[in-house]
Amino acid sequence: MGHEYIGIHKGWLERFAGRIRYAEGNAEIAPGITLVPHSTAGLERIGEMAHLSVKENGKYRYDSFDHEQSLVFDASKGLFVMNSCSHGGADNIVKEIEATFPGKKIYAILGGFHLFRYKDEVVRAFAERLRELDVQKIYTGHCTGNRAFEIVHEVLGDRAEQMHAGMTVEL
């Protein structure tokens, strides 16, 4: 399998070193705003299914997404979770956030779900898991894919909205 680099532009970490603050574990960056790392074990199987790898010590392995984070806002309606591509699975991310903030309700999740390459039955099973987690609003777009969004919307109804330029979401 060929590999294509899709990470941070080479040289940027060094070029912008003075502007980057590395976070380990949960990091409250302002009152009510927390960065939460992804820690679900076994996500390499999703990396394999999505054909996403990382290079470590000159060798490739399937990505476990342990370097990805969620930005969580503790808002009046409940927790609002933001992600980019949710590579490790938005359903897994919701479970991680629930474990991180016990007793707090997750109101919404916003991000791409990286489902554009998956078969319909995989997307449907994902949407059903998300429904069981009882998140009230799902805002998705980007790498979710149009067909996958159709399936997610079919399962979740108006709880699922497709993101678009100029969209406003109130916390």
Give the location of each predicted region.
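Cap/insert and terminal regions of metallo-dependent hydrolase folds
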Residues: 62-70, 74-81, 85-165
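Metallo-beta-lactamase
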Residues: 1-69, 161-170
